[in-house]
């Protein structure tokens, strides 16, 4: 079995280097795993990852967010805390961001060309500004507001 060299493979190598230089494990690990998948017999699973990867990632992210509550490190708020202005603002922002993410998925589905620009911006944000890869959905949601698309 010989390695296949192609533009996507070189792009993934560049992402790995950016991840290492930017000290960002998430981009380094993600790009490395995708490169290994692309260059080996695991490439047959890439369509499945493409289809379900975002859903699986959101599930894992949600588990990570909820685990401090389950472990007891964060207590559920009492009624007076739920009724505070900070909690109301947090709930409102959560609703707004979830709504933006939904708009983002719709925009990415209807205008796939935009995905390239959003991914490049997200990669730069991850590699150099300490961001995390939830950016494309929110960025696409903001983009949908700016271009007026659902």
UniProtKB/Swiss-Prot annotation:
GO cellular component: plasma membrane
Sorted UniProt keywords: Cell membrane, Membrane, Transmembrane, Transmembrane helix
Annotated coiled-coil segments of the chain: none
Transmembrane segments: 1-21, 52-72, 82-102, 114-134
Keyword Transcription regulation: no
Matching InterPro entries: UPF0756_TM (IPR007382)
Tagged with keyword Membrane: yes
Disulfide topology: none
Membrane topology: Multi-pass membrane protein
Cellular compartment(s): Cell membrane
Main location class: membrane
Family: Belongs to the UPF0756 family.
Matching PANTHER family: UPF0756 MEMBRANE PROTEIN YEAL
The protein's name in its UniProt record: UPF0756 membrane protein HD_1071
């Amino acid at each position: 079995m010989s390695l296949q060299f192609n533009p996507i493979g070189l792009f993934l190598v560049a992402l790995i280097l950016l991840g290492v230089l930017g000290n960002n494990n998430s981009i380094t690990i993600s790009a490395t795993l995708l490169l290994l998948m692309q260059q080996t017999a695991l490439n047959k699973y890439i369509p499945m990852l493409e289809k379900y990867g975002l859903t699986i990632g959101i599930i894992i992210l949600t588990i990570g967010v909820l685990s401090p509550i389950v472990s007891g490190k964060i207590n559920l708020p009492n009624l007076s805390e739920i009724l505070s202005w900070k909690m109301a603002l947090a709930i409102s922002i959560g609703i707004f961001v979830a709504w933006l993410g939904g708009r983002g998925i719709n925009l990415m589905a209807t205008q796939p060309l935009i995905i390239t620009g959003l991914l490049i911006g997200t990669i730069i944000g991850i590699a150099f500004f300490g961001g995390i890869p939830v950016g494309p959905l929110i960025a696409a949601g903001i983009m949908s507001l700016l271009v007026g698309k659902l």
